[in-house]
């Protein structure tokens, strides 16, 4: 782990989320794809110099509410499973995805937060 674990975790999560088949980014690209996962680091804590707990909000956009919830559920499952095999992320916890409409777009969004243990 380097001095800034948030910088390390985004590439690791992007790799873990590749099987979703949708773009994974920290920004919403222009033009916006029909389906998208955005990762937003939201902080965390560090118990020791070698251990950190990093929080990331995961937002999944899709054309329908059901598709957004399904994409978020898939992302959640991949993150929880990926923590078992990733070199950086050694444990993951995640809230359940919830629908969270995006009034600025015609897309539908579901979101959840994950806490990652990084050694």
Predicted regions and their residues:
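Short acidic low-complexity segments
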Residues: 24-31
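Charged, amphipathic alpha-helical segments and their flanking helix caps
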Residues: 1-22, 40-119
């Amino acid at each position: 782990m380097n001095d800034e674990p948030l910088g390390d975790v985004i590439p690791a999560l992007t790799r873990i989320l590749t099987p979703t088949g949708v773009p994974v980014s920290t920004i919403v690209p222009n033009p916006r794809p029909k389906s998208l996962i955005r990762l937003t680091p939201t902080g965390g804590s560090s118990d020791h110099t070698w251990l950190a707990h990093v929080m990331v909000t995961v937002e999944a956009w899709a054309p329908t509410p059901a598709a957004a919830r399904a994409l978020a559920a898939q992302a959640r499952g991949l993150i929880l499973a990926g923590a078992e095999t990733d070199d950086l992320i050694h444990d993951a916890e995640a809230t359940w995805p919830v629908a969270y409409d995006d009034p600025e777009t015609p897309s539908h969004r579901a979101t959840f937060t994950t806490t990652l243990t990084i050694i």
